[in-house]
Amino acid sequence: MARTKQTARKSTSIKAPRKQLAAKAARKSAPISGGIKKPHKFRPGTVALREIRKYQKTTDLLIRKLPFQRLVRDIAMEMKSDIRFQSQAILALQEAAEAYLVGLFEDTNLCAIHARRVTIMTKDLHLARRIRGERF
């Protein structure tokens, strides 16, 4: 039998939609897993090292100014009521406090490394302060 060319014709009759099987319908209605993108997870320690490099580059203050100011005023109220501070005085106190804390954590890290650890512990902090000659 010879082949004949078929041409597209517009359908005149309206067909009723077929009912889908329950399993097939459930698969179609379920969200596609490819559409939801999971957040990228870095390996443990990668973000910490990035933060260390970031904060070693910067020279700005690490503690927020207003909470530190409230802390200074709260401690000063215990000593003497009705005491005033210049903004430069609080800024100088904050610079000194941050320099002290950074140095203390450096010494604490050295104590942890001396104990063949990479995680600092309270005993490292106590040892660093003891070597410095501070009370705790």
Swiss-Prot record:
Subunit structure: The nucleosome is a histone octamer containing two molecules each of H2A, H2B, H3 and H4 assembled in one H3-H4 heterotetramer and two H2A-H2B heterodimers. The octamer wraps approximately 147 bp of DNA.
Main location: nucleus
CDD domains on file: HFD_H3
UniProt KW Nucleus keyword: yes
Transmembrane segments: none
PANTHER family cross-referenced by the UniProt entry: HISTONE H3 (PTHR11426)
Key words, A-Z: Chromosome, DNA-binding, Nucleosome core, Nucleus
Biological function: Macronuclear replacement variant which replaces conventional H3 in a subset of nucleosomes. Nucleosomes wrap and compact DNA into chromatin, limiting DNA accessibility to the cellular machineries which require DNA as a template. Histones thereby play a central role in transcription regulation, DNA repair, DNA replication and chromosomal stability. DNA accessibility is regulated via a complex set of post-translational modifications of histones, also called histone code, and nucleosome remodeling. Functions redundantly to H3.3.
Induction data: Up-regulated in the absence of H3.3.
Cellular component GO terms held in the UniProt record: nucleosome; nucleus
Localization terms from the record: Nucleus; Chromosome
Gene this chain is encoded by: HHT4
Molecular function terms from GO: DNA binding; protein heterodimerization activity; structural constituent of chromatin
Name listed for the protein in its UniProt record: Histone H3.4
Spans annotated as Disordered: 1-41
